[in-house]
């Protein structure tokens, strides 16, 4: 919670990645990536509820067995669609979309984005960075077009 606003974190996770199949279950120092990402959300000062959104029973069971709420969703073209499906039924003021393949995210970054968004009455925030040489042609790099 931040300034009396209830904040949910939805973590989309799917097994059928074409570039890295079963990515959410890949172990990092003995713990599955999806659990590491959920741990990051749990360490945020402002996240009130964490939900892993997945179409897969293996991920759902893993999360539930490790004290994380997981909801089975339909099949979606993007993770954003998966988050939107889950968000429709949440009783909260804000939804933080934390991608299930971002195990290097720091809880402080989440808190800073939440604080900035609420303090400045911003409807949508997206983290990004400037591209490095050659990345524009790399299909593994998600691109953001920003007009300043």
Region spans (language model):
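Conserved donor-nucleotide/metal-binding helix-loop-beta segment in metal-dependent transferases, i.e.
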Residues: 107-135
